[in-house]
């Protein structure tokens, strides 16, 4: 899978790591695995993950905070410590965790601390919540290599955090882009990411 960043800084240097394939993070013989990604507004992350071949389900939600049963208002108010995130259920025989990581890093700015564009706050932090030791190892290796190769031109601030309870967000947040393609934020922020995803990663889409 060629490396075509979709973040705010344009094209980074070519990265040899994206030519590698790796099944780390998969469970032998498993047809289903889950992974959790936080890359800014969960509407964006959900939209770029939903149509990938091998992805069975994407749920928007909250993770990494200290308050049980958070809701959107409290998370957006910075009162709970949670990040907006998505939980992806996928078939590792069709798409690997490493592939999903590549798309994650390509579709947001992992060098921006607690901010994605105009969305500011710890709830918009770039973070990974590995669910297995294999996922954690793969995530650390990718972050290290992207940093070594200076792919983004600035230090990566993506954190790797313990996978605490994932709280599924309110119903109206699910399938948000598909249900609201004409909404202003969707048109201005999400649609360009989805268009570039189709352009550069068309072979990974259904």
UniProtKB/Swiss-Prot annotation:
The active site is at 41. GO terms for biological process: protein modification process. One of its GO terms (molecular function) is peptide-methionine (S)-S-oxide reductase activity. Residues 13-29 have a biased composition (Polar residues). InterPro entries: Met_Sox_Rdtase_MsrA_dom, Met_Sox_Rdtase_MsrA_sf. Residues 1-30 are annotated as: Disordered. It holds the Pfam family PMSR. Disulfide bonds: none annotated. Residues 1-11 have a biased composition (Basic and acidic residues). It catalyses: L-methionyl-[protein] + [thioredoxin]-disulfide + H2O = L-methionyl-(S)-S-oxide-[protein] + [thioredoxin]-dithiol; [thioredoxin]-disulfide + L-methionine + H2O = L-methionine (S)-S-oxide + [thioredoxin]-dithiol. Has an important function as a repair enzyme for proteins that have been inactivated by oxidation. Catalyzes the reversible oxidation-reduction of methionine sulfoxide in proteins to methionine. Belongs to the MsrA Met sulfoxide reductase family. PANTHER family: PEPTIDE METHIONINE SULFOXIDE REDUCTASE, PEPTIDE METHIONINE SULFOXIDE REDUCTASE MSRA 2. This is Peptide methionine sulfoxide reductase MsrA. It comes from Deinococcus radiodurans (strain ATCC 13939 / DSM 20539 / JCM 16871 / CCUG 27074 / LMG 4051 / NBRC 15346 / NCIMB 9279 / VKM B-1422 / R1).
